[in-house]
Amino acid sequence: MNAAEWVAELKRKSQIESFKEQKGLVYDDHIEKVLYSGSVNGTLLVIEGNSCSGKTELLYHLASNVLLRSSQELVLIVSSEWDWSIKRLTFILHERLISSRGVSQTCKCNCAVKLENESTVHLQNAAREDGTDEDINSNSVNDVSLSSGETMLQFPEHEEQHECNREMEQLYESASSTVYPCSFWEDAERKIDAQCAILWPMEFSGVVESIPQSTKDLLRIWKEAKIQMHEDFRCNKTEFNEACFDASSSRLGCILMDGLSTFYWQLRLERGYTQVYADLQNRLCTSSKLFGCPVVCTNWLLNNKQHLPIQCKRFRSERRANARFYLENCVSKLGETFYLSVKGVQTKTEMASPYSQQEMEKV
């Protein structure tokens, strides 16, 4: 064995070990265990379901898994439904960072405090409008007699109470408008800013152009995404950092497309629309093979369109309650129910249909 063959063999072994290590890390998560089990690069993974069935919520957790796994993996997100929330992704990553670093208590910073105070002020305003405020109702009419020209503010005891209520209202308003980010929230924002690129295409042609076919193409898409995500990139004329695309340091972890069937009825009226979807599938599969990353799409309409030439591995998402949703493999008829909490994602395997075990094995 000469030196060139020896180096090639070492490189091949290191790639196999890194691939096994990556697969081991991926399979530690219950959601990725269902999605990525048995799939290879170049396979299009599609999560189907009705509106508000938890499809986008799944993508939030898949993106958080990549961001937590390594600081060298990038996430490309294409949201053609325009409802992708950066704040929601930051909140999920914020909670995952807290649980991964061994913090037992829930962090009460930022939007958690803001939402809590806003709900308190909203309840107080509603009670005041309905006349059910405890402070007002506690003052009985029999205790004091008011003349026609007097008001409650003219009495010393009621004046002190009114001033106290005013101070409390000012405190609630200041607390609801003030944001106190913690270190976990800042880390989540920093990770999303450095490792995520989010695009909101307005036309189907923009969706096709958002799928990279080379490293140079990925650099162009990443720069366009940063222009859409940050106004400072345009206003302050800050230079784009191309060092993150160094092949030796970073790699594309996954491509997430929210809304595969958004432009279906727009394309349905055009000639050759089936070929357009076939070209989109080819671009997605090519990107998966080129960058060695999974491609996950959401879809709510194309599951019954058998005439479309889209070959993919299908899953069904169904929301059962506010804190859990159901993910089913459409081929094996087996599913898992995921419970979302502050500690992360918990799962409970169960049958997806009332078939017997023998019938399930035949499938």
Swiss-Prot record:
<dbReference type="InterPro" id="IPR027417">
    <property type="entry name" value="P-loop_NTPase"/>
</dbReference>
<keyword id="KW-0227">DNA damage</keyword>
<dbReference type="GO" id="GO:0006312">
    <property type="term" value="P:mitotic recombination"/>
</dbReference>
<dbReference type="GO" id="GO:0005829">
    <property type="term" value="C:cytosol"/>
</dbReference>
<comment type="subunit">
    <text>Interacts with rdl1 and sws1.</text>
</comment>
<keyword id="KW-0963">Cytoplasm</keyword>
<keyword id="KW-0539">Nucleus</keyword>
<comment type="similarity">
    <text>Belongs to the RecA family. RAD51 subfamily.</text>
</comment>
<keyword id="KW-0234">DNA repair</keyword>
<dbReference type="GO" id="GO:0016887">
    <property type="term" value="F:ATP hydrolysis activity"/>
</dbReference>
<dbReference type="GO" id="GO:0005634">
    <property type="term" value="C:nucleus"/>
</dbReference>
<comment type="function">
    <text>Required for normal levels of meiotic recombination. Acts in the recombinational pathway of double-strand break (DSB) repair together with rhp51, rhp55 and rad22. Required for the full extent of DNA recombination and cell survival under condition of a replication fork collapse.</text>
</comment>
<keyword id="KW-0469">Meiosis</keyword>
<keyword id="KW-0233">DNA recombination</keyword>
<dbReference type="GO" id="GO:0007131">
    <property type="term" value="P:reciprocal meiotic recombination"/>
</dbReference>
<protein>
    <recommendedName>
        <fullName>DNA repair protein rlp1</fullName>
    </recommendedName>
</protein>
<dbReference type="GO" id="GO:0000724">
    <property type="term" value="P:double-strand break repair via homologous recombination"/>
</dbReference>
<dbReference type="GO" id="GO:0000725">
    <property type="term" value="P:recombinational repair"/>
</dbReference>
